[in-house]
């Protein structure tokens, strides 16, 4: 039995008082002080961890202004505040103690657009890709690019002055900010835009906080203008935080306070709104993927690409390429970046040409390719091959792979992981290759492995050395390397921070700004935030306050992680290896990961949030001398005893009375998970939440009783076959209002599915497929076996959607094969989901033994439901290891291509069919949609894939009362629009859960693709 974790870091009474006053005065947002909520805000995409006291989620600028006014009261003067966006920062920019002000949950509205003038006004929490999705119908996009664009907020981009691919042409975020609305400490509203210097002087003479800000920034930047121009490097990725250089335009005729706020990392004000310049979408885009024999060759050849008038040049090294090959993303780009025969591709330049003149762009591409051919013929520059990508879809797939590279590095094997701390250095592009030679020599001298990729056209290369942050010596080495890289960038006239902001690296600011300009930064900080209450420790302290700065060697996540025993860390690697890349925060509702995060917009209900909580839970267990691995081993031996039942009943009673246990907070986060397993493939680190969730639930319920519904769900494969003996009788009772009410109130289940009537057994009565024993099959000749197909049953289609199984048997027959319906053998998926892992292990072993015996017959085994079939490949392997055996159960679309003759039918024409894939299937088997389309094409029919996220049912998740509202809301995110837009009779759905959800919500059912094939065949 796990112990009660009764203590968690407390919250200061002053903080609680502040939050209470805030709510009393009309604050409309949310506040959070639970340990779980605070932990999810203690990390970002960096190596640092810093626990805040509370989190505030404002809904509007008015909420932020109220917050700032209340904070200005003398009794709350000691409280500090840090604005936070998407939490994707790589250097702890938004990590701090005190109170975190999260702009991402509610302040995500696009306020207005003026397409004629080319600008848009947004709130700070709008996500970059969300904005571009909105702008696309207008023919515009927001140009600054970054790899985390599907979860990074515009407020975060502005605060770090982010940039990425294409910056040589498009510049940084600050180049596209026309004006800002910000809230100052004290509650004053500051609106900024470029103004004539005369007006700036007038504003500076106003006797107000805003007036003092204008006056100070104007006077200090004007007085130091010559030094600023001399000191700031002449780089595309110019020095920001604070951007003294661009406050005035080159002619000194305009003054723009906006440029001080861009890159300020929340140290000056709360940025709540922005007016942004938007760019026309290019009509033509082409990519040339140039392959090299070494990474150095790719680097040294990059200037040649820029001279060819390319929009951008992105470079990827062999380490990143090889990690991409091992990821699901490679399936989407493998034909666009093929290997060169007899050559090893160790570097890649992704060269983009874009514009509105197709003839001009094609000529530029042709000229470049001709020159590349000449280099290859002469064996020069290390070029070994090239490919051109002409279509937009292919361009976007390649960039998706490149964007995922940053996360893929975290999936490197071993305890040492490539980490960010010197990953956005910038030097003049003409010096980049020589700089990288020295950088690599530095890392090689310490025996470190590393991955490299980046924007070579702008002189920025992302370098992530692999270090084990659980090793104190390697933590020291990180600081040593940082110091060396600072000196190296200075040697080449570059910057340590080319695009990701300073964060905990602010200690190096004096070295880059110089003593005089650093003093000016402090004066500017002082006029905005004289008491050092906004994200203190970042960029600089205000003049007059000698507060310490955050440092590179500050407390890191590894400080806490190393308190967990190595064996436990290794066993729970799914939770331990999450690096915070945040892909699970993807805003796109059509992306399968993560439905609970999408519907709640709460970080504790994301894979990252759940991994964070489990790590802390493991640490707290270790702190109490408890080894969860040993507890797991002991559980099967202990069995169920009266003593254990009494103890768990007592613990439940105390829990209902409000007794604190951190395990309850972890349980709450786990309960929101749909166990769809999208994270296990979509996450670059392959964080498998359902796997460690099941383990947690098993241990949690060693202390606390399970609800009745968990036992009912886990036992479905025991009672469903019995109920199917009399389906109409049981359906009669299931439909009774009193039973529905009883189920909802006392069991916590709603909309219970009806059994198939007639049952599968009744439908197959007398059919030869159901009358063959295993012994009869073993006695068949090889010739007879060649035409046999063994149908593996699952509990959901066989007992609740039997027509699908019956139709598959008919389809097999129509194709000239003899189907055999194998006896039902429990799969155990429901047991695994609910954390009955001891029972699941027994179920899995029994079924694996049966299927291994059947597999020896040499006949194909085929199952219908993706989630259940994939359980044989995933959960069985995790649980049984080598004892699983090597049986293979195919899905319908995997078997059909092998069964089809070479004679394809002519195109039938007519309306297409529309495929809705099960999210587990779509993410685990990315080729499935194309395979289904090819199968339909073989029969002369057209099948189009419908891009949707999760349907919201996920087995029994959608039937549980506590999940009902979220289940419907998840369906509404993407499925509902698609289902109502397309003809229902042409919509085909592979997953049983998904078909159930459609029928429940839309009132009419949909078919499995195999049923449409049966209709087509006639």
Regions picked out by a protein language model, each given a short descriptive name:
Residues 88-90, 148-155, 240-247, 314-331, ...:
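A glycine-rich phosphate-binding loop feature that marks nucleotide/adenosyl-phosphate handling sites
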Residues 548-581, 585-723, 841-847, 885, ...:
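Ferredoxin-type iron-sulfur electron-transfer modules in oxidoreductases and energy-metabolism complexes
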């Amino acid at each position: 039995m796990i112990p009660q974790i009764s203590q968690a870091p407390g919250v200061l009474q002053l903080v609680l008082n502040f939050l209470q006053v805030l709510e009393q005065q009309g604050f409309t947002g949310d506040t959070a002080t639970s340990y779980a909520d605070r932990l999810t805000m203690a990390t970002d995409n960096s190596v640092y961890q810093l626990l805040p006291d509370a989190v505030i989620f404002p809904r509007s600028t008015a909420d932020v202004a109220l917050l700032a006014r209340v904070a200005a009261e003398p009794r709350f003067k000691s409280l500090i505040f840090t604005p936070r966006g998407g939490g994707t920062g790589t250097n702890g920019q938004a990590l701090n103690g005190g109170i975190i002000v999260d702009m991402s949950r509610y302040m995500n509205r696009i306020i207005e657009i003026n397409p004629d003038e080319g600008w848009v006004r947004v709130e700070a929490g709008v996500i970059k890709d969300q904005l571009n999705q909105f702008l696309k119908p207008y023919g515009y996009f927001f140009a600054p690019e970054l790899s985390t664009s599907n979860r990074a907020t515009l407020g975060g981009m502005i605060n770090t002055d982010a940039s990425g691919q294409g910056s040589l042409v498009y510049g940084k975020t600050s180049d596209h900010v026309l004006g800002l609305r910000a809230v100052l400490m004290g509650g004053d509203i500051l609106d900024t835009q470029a103004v004539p210097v005369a007006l700036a002087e007038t504003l500076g003479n106003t006797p107000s906080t805003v007036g003092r800000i204008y006056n100070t920034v104007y006077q200090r930047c004007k007085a130091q203008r010559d030094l600023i121009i001399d000191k700031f490097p002449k780089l595309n990725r110019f020095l920001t935080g604070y951007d003294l250089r661009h406050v005035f335009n080159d002619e000194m005729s305009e003054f723009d306070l906006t440029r001080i706020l861009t890159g300020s990392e929340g140290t000056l004000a709360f940025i709540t709104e922005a007016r942004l310049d938007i760019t026309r979408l290019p009509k033509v885009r082409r990519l040339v993927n140039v392959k090299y024999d070494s990474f150095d060759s790719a680097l040294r050849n990059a200037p040649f690409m820029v001279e060819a008038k390319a929009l951008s040049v992105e470079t990827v090294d062999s380490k990143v390429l090889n990690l991409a090959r091992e990821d699901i993303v490679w399936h989407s780009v493998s034909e666009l970046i093929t290997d060169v025969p007899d050559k090893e591709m160790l570097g890649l330049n992704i060269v983009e040409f874009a514009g509105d003149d197709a003839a001009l762009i094609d000529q530029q591409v042709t000229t470049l390719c001709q020159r590349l051919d000449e280099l290859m013929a002469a064996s020069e520059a290390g070029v070994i091959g090239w490919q051109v990508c002409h279509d937009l879809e292919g361009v976007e797939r390649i960039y998706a792979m490149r964007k995922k590279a940053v996360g893929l590095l975290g999936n490197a094997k071993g305890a040492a992981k490539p980490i960010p701390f010197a990953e956005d250095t910038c030097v003049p592009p003409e010096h980049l290759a020589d700089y990288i030679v020295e950088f690599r020599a530095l890392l090689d001298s310490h025996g470190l492995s590393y991955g490299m990729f980046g924007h070579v056209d702008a002189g920025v290369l992302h370098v992530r050395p692999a270090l084990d942050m659980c090793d104190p010596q390697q933590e020291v080495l990180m600081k040593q390397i940082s110091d060396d890289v600072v000196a190296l960038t200075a040697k080449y006239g570059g910057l340590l921070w080319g695009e990701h902001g300073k964060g905990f690296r602010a200690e190096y600011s004096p070295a880059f700004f110089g003593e005089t300009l650093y003093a000016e930064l402090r004066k500017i900080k002082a006029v905005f935030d004289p008491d050092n209450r906004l994200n203190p420790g970042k960029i600089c302290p205000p003049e007059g306050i000698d507060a310490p700065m955050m440092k590179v060697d500050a407390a890191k996540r590894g400080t806490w992680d190393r308190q967990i025993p190595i064996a436990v860390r290794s066993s729970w690697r799914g939770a331990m290896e999450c690096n915070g890349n945040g892909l699970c925060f993807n805003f796109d509702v059509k992306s399968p990961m993560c439905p609970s995060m999408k519907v709640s917009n709460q970080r504790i209900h994301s894979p990252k949030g759940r991994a964070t909580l489990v790590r802390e839970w493991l640490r707290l267990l270790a702190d109490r001398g408890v080894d969860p691995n040993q507890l797991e081993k002991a559980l099967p031996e202990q069995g169920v005893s009266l003593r254990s039942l009494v103890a768990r009943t007592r613990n439940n009673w105390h829990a209902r009375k409000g007794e604190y246990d951190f395990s309850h907070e972890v349980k709450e986060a786990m309960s929101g998970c749909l166990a769809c397993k999208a994270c296990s493939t979509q996450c670059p680190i392959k964080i498998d939440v359902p796997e460690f969730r099941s383990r947690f639930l098993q241990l949690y319920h060693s202390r606390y009783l399970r609800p009745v519904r968990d036992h009912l769900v886990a036992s479905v494969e025991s009672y469903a076959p019995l109920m199917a003996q009399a389906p109409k009788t049981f359906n009669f009772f299931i439909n009774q209002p009193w039973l529905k009410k009883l189920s909802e109130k006392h069991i916590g289940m709603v909309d219970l599915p009806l059994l198939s009537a007639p049952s599968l057994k009744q439908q197959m009565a007398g059919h030869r497929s159901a009358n063959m024993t295993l012994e009869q099959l073993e006695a068949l000749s090889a010739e007879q076996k060649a035409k046999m197909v063994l149908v593996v049953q699952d509990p959901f289609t066989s007992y609740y959607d039997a027509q699908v199984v019956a139709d598959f048997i008919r389809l097999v027959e129509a194709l000239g094969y003899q189907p055999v319906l194998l006896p039902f053998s429990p799969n155990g998926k429901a047991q695994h989901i609910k954390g009955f892992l001891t029972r699941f292990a027994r179920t899995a072993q029994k079924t694996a033994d049966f299927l291994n015996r059947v597999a020896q017959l040499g006949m194909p085994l085929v199952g219908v439901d993706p989630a259940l079939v994939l359980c044989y490949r995933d959960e069985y392997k995790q649980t049984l290891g080598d004892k699983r055996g090597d049986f293979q159960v195919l899905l319908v679309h995997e078997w059909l291509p092998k069964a089809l003759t070479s004679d394809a039918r002519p195109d039938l024409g007519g309306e297409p069919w529309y495929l809705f894939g099960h999210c587990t299937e779509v993410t685990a088997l990315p080729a499935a949609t194309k395979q289904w389309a090819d199968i339909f094409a073989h029969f002369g029919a057209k099948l189009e894939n419908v891009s949707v996220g999760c349907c919201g049912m996920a087995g029994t998740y959608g039937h549980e009362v506590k999940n009902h509202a979220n289940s419907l809301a998840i369906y509404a995110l993407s499925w509902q629009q698609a289902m109502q837009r397309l003809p229902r009779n042409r919509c085909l759905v592979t997953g049983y859960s998904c078909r159930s959800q459609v029928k429940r919500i839309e009132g009419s059912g949909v078919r499995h693709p195999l049923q449409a094939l049966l209709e087509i065949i006639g």
